[in-house]
């Protein structure tokens, strides 16, 4: 599912390595098996600012299951209690029991609201995408359009590894395009220019191309990236505020 607005089209913080691992282990499972999108639901709820505020001594199991039910149903999981036990077995570092209920595990508790926000957008990006041969491709597009460029890279990389010829080159260019926007989110101009140097040269004038998974329009994202590169090369210094006023780039499957 894609949204016009995204909290990620602005400068983003750096997560500590342990938080990056926490996010990535759950997200990679969701990419590997669509049914494992369920593992994004639990930290999303536990780290939610509203839950943390309303359940200061922990959210009771019964309430946790109620909160999870609709999100789980949207990814074809019908039994919240079974999903919760399955998640706890795989990821014992998600939650700890306190006085009356569950709280985020100490390993990510300090970052809970930000982790919940990112995981929530990961889940929203993957929800509504049918399992099938083009699952990863459609996930990559949705993630890109929601400003989750690092996750877009992770979705497209397996396709690139298995591709051949022109398709492999096209996928590599898409991955590098997404990687450049990821660097921009951290205001790393050198990183963006490095990965975009090859990608923008390869994609120059190619606003639409055909892959085995479908036809993709990327001209809007190419236009935005070109405007950003011009700003990065400005002799007057980089105006990051000007960059963040640009429209959020997007890809369109046609």
Model-based region annotation:
Residues 154-176, 201-211:
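Short, charge-rich amphipathic alpha-helical segments embedded
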């Amino acid at each position: 599912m894609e949204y016009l607005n995204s909290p990620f089209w602005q400068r983003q913080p750096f997560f500590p390595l342990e938080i990056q691992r926490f996010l990535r282990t759950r997200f990679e499972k969701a990419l590997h098996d669509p049914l494992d999108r369920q593992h994004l639901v639990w930290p999303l709820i536990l780290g939610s600012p509203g839950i943390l505020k309303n359940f200061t001594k922990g959210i009771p199991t019964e309430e946790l299951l109620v909160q999870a039910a609709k999100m789980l149903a949207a990814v074809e999981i019908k039994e919240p209690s079974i999903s919760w036990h399955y998640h706890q077995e795989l990821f014992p570092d998600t939650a700890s029991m306190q006085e009356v209920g569950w709280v985020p595990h100490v390993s990510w508790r300090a970052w809970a609201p930000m982790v919940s926000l990112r995981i929530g957008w990961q889940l929203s990006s993957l929800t509504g995408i049918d399992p099938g041969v083009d699952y990863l491709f459609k996930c990559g597009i949705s993630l890109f359009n929601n400003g989750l460029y690092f996750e877009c890279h992770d979705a497209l990389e397996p396709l690139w590894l298995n591709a051949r010829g022109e398709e492999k080159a096209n996928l590599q260019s898409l991955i590098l395009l997404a990687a450049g926007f990821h660097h921009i989110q951290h205001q790393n101009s050198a990183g963006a220019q490095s990965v975009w140097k090859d990608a923008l040269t390869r994609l120059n004038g190619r606003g639409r191309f055909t892959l085995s998974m479908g036809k993709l329009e990327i001209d809007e994202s190419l236009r935005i990236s070109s405007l950003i590169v011009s700003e990065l090369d400005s002799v007057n210094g980089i105006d990051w505020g000007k960059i963040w006023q640009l429209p959020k780039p997007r890809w369109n499957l046609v």
